[in-house]
Amino acid sequence: GKKFNVIKNGIDYSKYRYQLKNRTECRKSISVADGYLVGCIGRLDPQKNPLMSVEIMKEISKLNATAKFVFVGDGELRPQVEQKIKEYNLEDRIVLLGARDDANKWYSAIDCLIMPSLFEGLPFTLVEAQAAGLSCVVSNTVSGDANITGLIEYVDLNQSTKVWADHILEACEKERLDTKEQLKKAGYSIQDTAEQVDKIIQTSLEKRVQC
């Protein structure tokens, strides 16, 4: 067979790294000053299991009087998510932002990213979250390869929402980490990726010239 090269998606660390300015601006835009802010960043579709996220937030709201939740993304399940929020009287605790051009800034605003997905490979959202030094609580369907920095905690989908809520509130208390070197070492630097692509193109051109 032909030889091929595997190149990882590079990430612009400067775009996703934690920035207090982004945290302040994003939180102010949804009237959240202090207190924990938990978030889902991704599509509102069956795979991402957003209805379970609402169930988890219902449990978190019992355990923490000030915690709030934000969905960054849109999708086919939005009407059901809105209905569930209303059913649980969580309108003052959950914000639906829809699809955003500034999703990268919200990694600085939230204290924990959750992903109770029914199935996943290696979602790039988790690479972005780790670039922001953000703690993540995800389902055990997510690939173990996603845990580049040790910031990801895996919870069995069959566990109760109370178990999920406990893990999430613990994650919210964790300090942010500077993950730039870890991501670079793992091959996610956009500069390194660009150099790899350039090298492959140059090698390919040289081979053609020799033919």
Segments and roles (model prediction):
Residues 82-98:
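Nucleotide-activated donor-binding/catalytic signature segment of Leloir-type glycosyltransferases, i.e.
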Residues 175-211:
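A charged, aromatic-enriched C-terminal amphipathic alpha-helix characteristic of glycosyltransferases
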Residues 17-32:
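A short helix/loop element that forms part of the nucleotide-sugar donor recognition site in Leloir-type
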Residues 99, 118:
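Aromatic "clamp/platform" in nucleotide-sugar-dependent glycosyltransferases that forms part
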Residues 135-139:
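Short hydrophobic beta-strand element within catalytic cores of glycosyltransferases
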Residues 10:
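Carbohydrate-associated surface elements
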Residues 36, 40-59, 76-82:
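A conserved mid-protein helix/loop that constitutes part of the nucleotide-sugar donor-binding site
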